[in-house]
């Protein structure tokens, strides 16, 4: 990330306790991982060290996230909202666990009964491509009768790669026809079948995101 001047902190509006809420967001898929509090000292420590430091209201002390568990958060970018009273940190979560329950995100509840981070914990909302890949992985690991995705996976490379070739040709034709709706639809078809191929070969969508981020040369979402 680009170095920030001390004036950055001076722009912020802290509450009467000298604190400001901070949202931690995954730097690749945009998933919201947690919310914590920061003060001037923790912000400065975060900027100096490159790892997220928060302020613990219960312990009344500086809190280096992951110092004990090993689940540290590498800072990728930091910004504040239009009122300068909320921070947004994009971070790289070590171990892919942000919550003390062991869940990836603290925002895993959404049902009538609490899951407490167990097997019923919800995955954090993310971008459409990440959500799609989750469904494909779920079909791979827990096949459903009549599922088109499972039919592709059962057919292996021959069936999957044939479909990628067919959809690629249709995408080319849509581009030649200069039809925006068809172009978008065919692009979506290619992406879906490509993700099925990735899942079939045990390659995660996140690996693809990491390659794209590295090629871009900037630790921010596109």
Curated annotation (Swiss-Prot):
The keyword Hydrolase applies. The gene is hisI. It is found in: Cytoplasm. HAMAP family: HisE, HisI, HisIE. CDD domains: NTP-PPase_HisIE_like. Its main location: cytoplasm. This is Histidine biosynthesis bifunctional protein HisIE. One of its GO terms (molecular function) is phosphoribosyl-AMP cyclohydrolase activity. It comes from Parasynechococcus marenigrum (strain WH8102). In the N-terminal section; belongs to the PRA-CH family. Disulfide bonds: none annotated. The lineage of its organism: Bacteria, Bacillati, Cyanobacteriota, Cyanophyceae, Synechococcales. One of its GO terms (biological process) is L-histidine biosynthetic process. Keywords: Amino-acid biosynthesis, ATP-binding, Cytoplasm, Histidine biosynthesis, Hydrolase, Multifunctional enzyme, Nucleotide-binding. It comes from the Bacteria. The keyword Nucleotide-binding applies. It catalyses: 1-(5-phospho-beta-D-ribosyl)-ATP + H2O = 1-(5-phospho-beta-D-ribosyl)-5'-AMP + diphosphate + H(+); 1-(5-phospho-beta-D-ribosyl)-5'-AMP + H2O = 1-(5-phospho-beta-D-ribosyl)-5-[(5-phospho-beta-D-ribosylamino)methylideneamino]imidazole-4-carboxamide. Residues 1-128 are annotated as: Phosphoribosyl-AMP cyclohydrolase. Pathway: Amino-acid biosynthesis; L-histidine biosynthesis; L-histidine from 5-phospho-alpha-D-ribose 1-diphosphate: step 2/9; Amino-acid biosynthesis; L-histidine biosynthesis; L-histidine from 5-phospho-alpha-D-ribose 1-diphosphate: step 3/9. Its EC number is 3.5.4.19, 3.6.1.31. It is an enzyme of class 3 (hydrolase). Residues 129-222 are annotated as: Phosphoribosyl-ATP pyrophosphohydrolase. GO terms for cellular component: cytoplasm.
């Amino acid at each position: 990330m680009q170095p920030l001047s001390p004036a950055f902190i001076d722009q912020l509006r802290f509450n009467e306790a000298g604190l400001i809420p901070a949202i931690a967001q995954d730097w690749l898929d945009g998933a919201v991982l947690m919310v914590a509090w920061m003060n001037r000292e923790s912000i400065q420590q975060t900027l100096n060290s490159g790892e997220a430091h928060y302020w613990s209201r219960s312990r009344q002390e500086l809190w280096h996230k992951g110092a004990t568990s090993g689940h540290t958060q590498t800072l990728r970018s930091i910004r504040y909202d239009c009122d300068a009273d909320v921070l947004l940190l994009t971070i790289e979560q070590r171990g892919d666990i942000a919550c003390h329950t062991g869940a990836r995100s603290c925002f895993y509840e959404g049902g009538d009964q609490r899951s407490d981070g167990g097997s019923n914990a919800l995955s954090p909302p993310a971008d459409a491509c990440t959500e799609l890949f989750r469904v494909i992985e779920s079909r791979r690991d827990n096949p459903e009768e009549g599922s088109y995705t499972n039919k592709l996976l059962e057919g292996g490379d021959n069936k999957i790669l044939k479909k990628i070739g067919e959809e690629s040709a249709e995408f080319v034709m849509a581009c030649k026809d200069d039809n925006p709706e068809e172009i978008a639809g065919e692009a979506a078809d290619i992406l879906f079948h490509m993700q099925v191929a990735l899942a079939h070969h045990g390659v995660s969508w996140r690996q693809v995101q990491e390659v794209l981020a590295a090629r871009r040369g900037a630790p921010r979402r596109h």
